[in-house]
């Protein structure tokens, strides 16, 4: 019998860690911190179907345990790409919500207005 284990929480933690690494490289400015906050907010949730596909392909290819970190890196990359595609789609469609929360451009719009003082 074939089984694939997928850990959505671990993937979410890795995405947050990746974004935290990006944030650590940026100068500590309000603008860049706000951008990072938006990315963290936008990459939470979802079914993670593409990442599950990466995991399934890795497992079907008889994924070796020493390559698990590379598989997780691939999952993070696919999820970040998907988030960018969804953000683009929301802009084109002028959508206010994504998964019941403000779409990324609306999140940034609200954040930007709160910073205009």
Question: What do the PLM-derived regions correspond to, one by one?
Answer:
Residues 1-78, 83, 87, 91-112:
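Conserved N-terminal diphosphate/IPP-binding helix and adjacent helical/loop segment
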């Amino acid at each position: 019998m074939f089984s694939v284990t997928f850990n959505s929480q671990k993937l979410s933690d890795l995405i947050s860690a990746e974004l935290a690494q990006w944030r650590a490289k940026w100068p500590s400015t309000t603008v860049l911190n706000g951008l990072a906050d938006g990315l963290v907010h936008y990459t939470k949730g979802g079914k993670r179907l593409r990442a599950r596909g990466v995991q399934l392909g890795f497992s079907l290819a008889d994924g070796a345990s020493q390559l698990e970190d590379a598989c997780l890196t691939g999952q993070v990359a696919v999820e970040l790409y998907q988030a960018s595609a969804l953000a683009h789609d929301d802009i084109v469609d002028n959508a206010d919500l994504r998964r019941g929360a403000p779409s990324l451009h609306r999140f940034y719009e609200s954040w930007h207005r709160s910073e205009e003082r």
